[in-house]
A protein has these predicted regions:
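A short, gly/pro- and small-residue-rich
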Residues: 89, 175-197
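Short glycine-rich or small-residue beta-strand-to-loop segments that form or flank ligand, phosphate
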Residues: 65-76, 100-106
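Conserved small/polar residues in nucleotide/adenosyl-binding loops
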Residues: 213-216
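N-terminal amphipathic/basic leader segments beginning at the initiator methionine
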Residues: 1-45
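Glycine-rich phosphate/diphosphate-binding loops that line cofactor/substrate pockets in enzymes
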Residues: 51-67, 91-97
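Auxiliary alpha/beta "docking" domains used to position bulky ligands
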Residues: 92, 96-110
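Histidine-anchored nucleotide/phosphate-binding helix
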Residues: 75-96
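An acidic, phosphate/nucleotide-engaging active-site surface
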Residues: 111-180
């Protein structure tokens, strides 16, 4: 009998398979990969040596309102590692920056206090300004025009009125949007329900080109 531990949420599930029913075990080459440095060092290195863009600290100079869009509780982004370094980099360039962390929930439910603490740690949760996006809060949306799909584009006022807008998260292939992260931090991340439904809907998912986009 072979025993396997399968990752499941924050825990693991145990599975047992009889040897006679086990054809083999496929092990990814990443299984034994060892990064040349730790996670915090990798992020710091990226912040100090960005590709094709000025350093974040330089972009933050003279920017009063800075908004950092962060993924919500549904995305396993290691924000405990990333966010402190992003905030430090912004304040390196502008110690007086008024920074708001905007949680990009899209149409998801509100991120709870406990989930924020789990994501960022108590230091950031206690001492930084964190706003959870609400797609139905129309009073805090700004109209920015028409989408190619014909829908109205409403985006969270904090993001629109920021002097500097930063998106924290990961980028991976997406089966109909091309790639997640980046632009998706804004739409659907901090857009209104009406706007999201014009851009993120069943018709797009069912489109014949949706799978093709995921490999572009």
């Amino acid at each position: 009998m072979r025993e396997f531990l399968l990752p499941y949420g924050k825990e693991t599930l145990k599975a047992e398979i009889e040897e006679e029913h086990l054809a083999g075990v496929l092990v990814s080459e990443l299984h034994d990969y060892k990064a040349p440095m730790g996670g915090a060092q990798l992020v710091q290195e990226a912040l100090e040596h960005p590709i094709g863009t000025p350093r974040l600290c330089d972009m933050a100079i003279d920017k009063k309102k800075v908004v950092v869009i962060s993924s919500d509780h549904t995305r396993p982004v290691p924000s405990r590692i990333i966010m402190p370094l992003i905030l430090k980099e912004i304040r390196r360039g502008n110690p007086d920056a008024d920074i708001t962390i905007l949680i990009s929930t899209g149409l998801h439910r509100e991120t709870t206090r406990e989930e924020l603490e789990s994501k960022f740690g108590p230091e950031i949760t206690e001492h930084e300004t964190i706003i959870v996006h609400d797609c139905d809060d129309t009073d805090n949306m700004v109209y920015l025009g028409k989408l190619p799909s014909g829908g109205n584009m409403y985006i969270n006022r904090l993001a629109v009125e920021a002097d500097l807008l930063v998106a924290e998260g990961f980028i991976e292939p997406h089966f109909f949007a091309g790639f997640s992260g980046g632009r998706k931090s804004v739409l659907p991340g901090v857009a209104s329900r009406e706007t999201v439904m014009y851009n993120h809907n069943s018709a797009f998912i069912d489109d014949l080109h949706s799978d093709r986009k995921s490999v572009v």
